[in-house]
Amino acid sequence: MKAQFDQNLLSSFYLWFENRLLKDDIKAYVQDLDNTFKYVEFSDLPSDFIGYQGQFRQLVAENSVESPNSGVFINGDFVTGDSSANGSVFIDNQEGRVVLPLASGTNLEITANSTVKEINTYISNDSDLNIILQSDFVENGQTSPYFFNQSEKLDEKTFFLPACFISLASSGNDEHCFGGMEETKSRIQVMVLTRDNFIIDSIISKFRDTARESINNIPYESFPYGFSYSVKSFPYEYDELKSNFEDGMTTHIDKVGVSKVFSEKLREAINKDFSIATMDFDLSTYRFPRL
């Protein structure tokens, strides 16, 4: 099945949002962290691959940052992050792990100097309430290493904070002019979870001021992350990717509404002491949906 407008919009927004957090005016990443990886049995990998888990989640894939991630050292030898040139070694930027062919073995020594996100980002297809009620959270602070332990129940419902959860809340079409052009009005909601109020204040302040910016629509099939959240075309730069679609569809940010959630009753009910903020992005896209 081909991706439709909503998938294109959500993935394009995610890439824009992720990149916005890495810009010099907010710089939500930590660089040059000593990182070691250890072998872990992962149930989500194909049977012909194995994984080594690093100490930090959500490595920065963007190449334009200071000290970009270029690869890892395996048994003392540098291995580039380009899977097409390194013998099918994949850097899983989302989970912070190295994925290798099964024949590589389980006794490798893998290290890196890593640049990691200070704010993790997730695309969510669940409601905010379900995420809060049904998920587990680890607030590791990206300057503090955290090792996956197989005795712990870390799965797809475990998220590492601070984090932003991005979801498409609503959308609708309004007739704009004769000829079939319509205005698609969409609302994307971002929920921010952390125990650090400084981080929440910084995020909502920065993104409140993005009102009236524009976002290039990047086709879903051009999403830069592929197998195990590795970069399809290495190195990856968001600005370079979006420049390929400057003549395509553009989405405008009409308004950004932000609010903090202060509810001791909610915190007691879910037994989680983090702070919550929401950001509602009201978006407008002029398009010909029936052509």
For every predicted segment, state its role.
Residues 111, 187-193, 278-284:
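Residue-level recognition of well-ordered beta-strand positions that form the cores
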